[in-house]
């Protein structure tokens, strides 16, 4: 059986389920501008309503801002990192509702803001693969390990971002939030991905940058949950990971 070698551990592996944002691609490069555009539009509308956020700006989506107001980081346990687009929409609409806007108008307004922000994302196409990822994907292909993406984003968006990076062909299954009833941290998406890879969940490994990924894997009964965190001073949030890597070159594949 094919084995993954991580920090001395030998892990039997018949398939790998990857998160995408922050795991396959540079999260902030793609989603930072989206969140910044969205929050700026929301701030302007709140000002027009004579209202302010119910929490500090940083806590609305879980973002970190510099003195100029630009997003320079994010909370790996926050909504921006983990929530689905629909969940973020509801969260932001709640701010407008609290400011006095009817709920239906608040939802419509946030969807319009999100469309503007997504248009900018599509124009920029700032999706870059994580360092060492391509080499690891090629090793998996050489070892005939089937791969899947399991994401809180939509399936179509995930496929688009994989295309931008030129790595779509590596993945047999793409499971977005629109293909399941319960998203992460529930195990439903992992079960579906494993069925499409024709493997048992107990033969799969999950790789992700949020603890929601790790919990999804454990709920599905996968053999190993591998946390990915390039920042050397971070990673404490990955409490349900069996192990944490900082770079893809820390994983060896043997047949």
Residue ranges and their predicted role:
Residues 23, 151-153:
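Conserved phosphate-coupling serine/threonine residues in phosphotransfer and NTP-handling enzymes
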Residues 1-16, 44-45, 134-142, 155-255:
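Asp-based, Mg2+/Mn2+-dependent phosphohydrolase catalytic module
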Residues 123-124, 137, 145:
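Compact structured core domains
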Residues 101, 140, 145:
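Short phosphate-binding/catalytic loops that engage adenosine nucleotides
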Residues 84, 128, 150, 181-182, ...:
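Residues that cap or flank secondary-structure elements
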Residues 11-131:
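N-terminal helical cap/lid subdomain that shapes the substrate entry/recognition surface
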Residues 17-20, 144-148:
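Short glycine-rich or small-residue beta-strand-to-loop segments that form or flank ligand, phosphate
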């Amino acid at each position: 059986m094919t084995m993954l070698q991580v920090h001395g551990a030998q892990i039997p592996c018949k398939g790998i389920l990857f998160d995408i944002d922050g795991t396959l691609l540079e999260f902030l490069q793609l989603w930072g501008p989206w969140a910044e555009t969205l929050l700026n539009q929301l701030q302007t509308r709140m000002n027009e309503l004579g209202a302010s956020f119910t929490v500090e700006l940083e806590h609305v989506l879980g973002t970190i801002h510099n003195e100029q107001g630009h997003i320079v980081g994010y909370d790996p346990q926050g909504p921006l990192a983990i929530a689905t687009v629909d969940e973020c929409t509801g969260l932001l609409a709640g701010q407008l509702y609290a400011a006095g806007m009817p709920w239906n108008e608040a939802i419509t307004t946030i969807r319009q803001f999100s469309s503007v922000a997504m248009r900018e994302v599509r124009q920029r196409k700032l999706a870059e693969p994580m360092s060492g990822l391509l080499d690891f994907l090629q090793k998996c292909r050489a070892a005939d390990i089937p791969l899947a993406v399991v994401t809180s984003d939509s399936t179509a968006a995930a496929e688009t971002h994989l295309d931008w990076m030129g790595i779509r062909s590596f993945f047999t299954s793409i499971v977005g939030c629109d293909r399941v009833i319960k998203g992460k941290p529930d195990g439903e998406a992992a079960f579906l991905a494993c069925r499409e890879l024709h493997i048992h969940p107990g033969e799969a490994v999950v790789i992700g940058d949020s603890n929601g990924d790790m919990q999804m894997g454990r709920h599905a009964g996968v053999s190993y949950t591998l946390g990915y965190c390039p920042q050397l001073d971070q990673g404490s949030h990955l409490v349900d990971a069996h192990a944490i890597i900082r770079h893809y070159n820390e994983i060896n594949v043997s047949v």
